[in-house]
C-alpha cells in the first residue's frame, strides 16, 4: 500500500500581497505580529515572509526596540 505525501501549503508573503515597499519601525501593530509572546522575532518559515520583507521586518523591529517602541522582552 503506497502512501501519498501531503504537500505543504506554500505560505505567501503578506507584505508582498499588501504591496509594501517599506516596513516602518513606527508601525508597532504590524511589527508585533512578527514577535512571539516572549518578544522574539518569528522566523520566516513560520510567518511565510519572503527574504526581502523578513530582512525589512528584522531591521524595523530592532530599530523600534532601540527607540523604546517595542520591548526587548515580554515577561
Swiss-Prot record:
Transmembrane segments: none annotated. The keyword Ribosomal protein applies. SUPFAM superfamilies: Ribosomal protein S18. GO terms for molecular function: small ribosomal subunit rRNA binding; structural constituent of ribosome. GO terms for biological process: translation. Keywords: Ribonucleoprotein, Ribosomal protein, RNA-binding, rRNA-binding. One of its GO terms (cellular component) is cytosolic small ribosomal subunit. It comes from the Bacteria. Binds as a heterodimer with protein bS6 to the central domain of the 16S rRNA, where it helps stabilize the platform of the 30S subunit. Part of the 30S ribosomal subunit. Forms a tight heterodimer with protein bS6. This is Small ribosomal subunit protein bS18. It comes from Thermotoga petrophila (strain ATCC BAA-488 / DSM 13995 / JCM 10881 / RKU-1). The gene is rpsR.
Amino acid at each position: 500500500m503506497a502512501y501519498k505525501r501531503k504537500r505543504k501549503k506554500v505560505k505567501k508573503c503578506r507584505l508582498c500581497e499588501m504591496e509594501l515597499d517599506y516596513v516602518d519601525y513606527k508601525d508597532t501593530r504590524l511589527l508585533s505580529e512578527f514577535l512571539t509572546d516572549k518578544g522574539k522575532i518569528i522566523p520566516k518559515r513560520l510567518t511565510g515572509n519572503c527574504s526581502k520583507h523578513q530582512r525589512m521586518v528584522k531591521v524595523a523591529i530592532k530599530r523600534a526596540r532601540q527607540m523604546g517602541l517595542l520591548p526587548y522582552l515580554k515577561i
